[in-house]
A protein has these predicted regions:
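Flavin-dependent oxidoreductase catalytic core characteristic
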Residues: 1-194
């Protein structure tokens, strides 16, 4: 942005804003993964999980306190969709084209072609279908509710959850593909098992 003639402070803010959606999704996913892992840790320890001499008790307290005072996961879910829609309305992100393509595809005969032999073809297809599902559900919600959709937080939260899970699935796939390209398939079996 500085190359475009913007002052440094505006460039830094603009750069950070560019990743705000991804940051919001990662924050929700990460903190909820922590909550799940800590809850399971308490379960594994049984009644001892609440006893101070076990480390899991502190992890559980910290995680639980975060859930009580934080409340930002709900805000970040709404922020994810709000910023995405603002980018679409501002012409920075084309949502209408892909949404119309999904709607058109729903009216056509599905492709029952054979699987590609390309690495990760199945995973790529699944992620593509997850994205289509988001566009389909969001499109149906917007068509039915129009401007009232802003007040339908339950629908927005579910759409955000779909987007968060899809973003994380695609991120894992892309990371695994990159690691395999860098190191070779032979040494990357644990990543392939993911």
């Amino acid at each position: 942005l500085q190359l475009a003639g913007k002052p440094e402070n505006e460039s830094l803010l603009g750069g950070a804003e560019e990743y705000a959606i991804e940051c919001a999704m990662l924050k929700v996913y990460g903190s909820e993964a922590l909550d799940y892992v800590v809850d399971e840790g308490v379960q594994v320890h049984g009644g001892n999980g609440f006893s101070a001499e076990y480390n899991i008790s502190r992890a559980y307290r910290d995680s639980r306190i975060n859930r009580i005072y934080e409340g930002t996961n709900e805000i970040n879910r709404l922020l994810t969709l709000d910023m995405t829609l603002k980018r679409a309305m501002g012409g920075r992100l084309d949502l209408m084209g892909p949404a119309m393509a999904v709607q058109k595809e729903l009216m056509s005969i599905p492709d029952f072609g054979t699987e590609d032999d390309v690495p990760f073809a199945k995973e790529k297809r699944q992620i593509k279908n997850l994205k289509k599902a988001i566009l389909m559900v969001a499109g149906a919600a917007v068509q039915k509710l129009m401007m009232k959709i802003e007040g339908e937080q339950e629908i927005l939260m579910n759409l955000a959850d779909m987007a968060i899970e899809t973003f994380n699935a695609e991120s894992v796939l892309l990371r695994v593909m990159k690691i395999i390209d860098q190191r070779g398939e032979a040494v990357c079996q644990p990543y392939l098992d993911i």
